[in-house]
Amino acid sequence: MIGLRPAFSTMLFLLLLTGGVYPLLTTALGQWWFPWQANGSLIHKDNVIRGSALIGQSFTAAGYFHGRPSATADTPYNPLASGGSNLAASNPELDAQIQARVAALRAANPQASSAVPVELATASASGLDNNLTPGAAAWQIPRVAAARQLPVEQVAQLVAEYTHRPLASFLGQPVVNIVELNLALDALQGHRAK
């Protein structure tokens, strides 16, 4: 029994440290230093939570920028079902899905003259991406401007405003948060797109 006492004491100490002290300390530090991020990076408009800056949403109306396709089962951008399609690059079903997305994108964006950006035709590993490259957002500008009856230059300026650049180029590439951009479009016009 004497040999078990140090083992139980060590177990109890580590249980309190890793199960109590460490989680409380990291939660407190997160709330103190990064309160917005620690609480889910929620976007509030008119005292209502409109979404998270970290999770994409399904925007399908012509007056909205469309994000990457979601691979989540049943409901697009369902955070409870996060994950990719798990289809191999050699799987004919994946090729068929991409071809169908490209055809739908071309039909929805007849003003776009260049090739469909890859990230608009392929789902991400999480299925919840909220960001696009500035090029993929720019590809959609003519459709959004026409649907909202706004000058192309004004929509392009809004895309430029919502392009987030990393502190240094080796830390990543510029991205456009589609949720924030679409909410800014609504705020610009004072209503939701049809």
From Swiss-Prot:
Subcellular compartments: Cell inner membrane
GO molecular function (one): ATP binding
Membrane-spanning segments: 12-34
Keyword Disulfide bond: no
Topological relation to the membrane, as annotated: Single-pass membrane protein
Keyword terms of this UniProt record: ATP-binding, Cell inner membrane, Cell membrane, Ion transport, Membrane, Nucleotide-binding, Potassium, Potassium transport, Transmembrane, Transmembrane helix, Transport
Cellular component GO terms held in the UniProt record: plasma membrane
Family statement drawn from the similarity comment of this UniProt entry: Belongs to the KdpC family.
HAMAP family: KdpC
Subunit structure as annotated in this protein's UniProt entry: The system is composed of three essential subunits: KdpA, KdpB and KdpC.
Function of the molecule: Part of the high-affinity ATP-driven potassium transport (or Kdp) system, which catalyzes the hydrolysis of ATP coupled with the electrogenic transport of potassium into the cytoplasm. This subunit acts as a catalytic chaperone that increases the ATP-binding affinity of the ATP-hydrolyzing subunit KdpB by the formation of a transient KdpB/KdpC/ATP ternary complex.
Protein's name in the database: Potassium-transporting ATPase KdpC subunit
Organism name: Salmonella heidelberg (strain SL476)
Organism phylogeny: Bacteria, Pseudomonadati, Pseudomonadota, Gammaproteobacteria, Enterobacterales
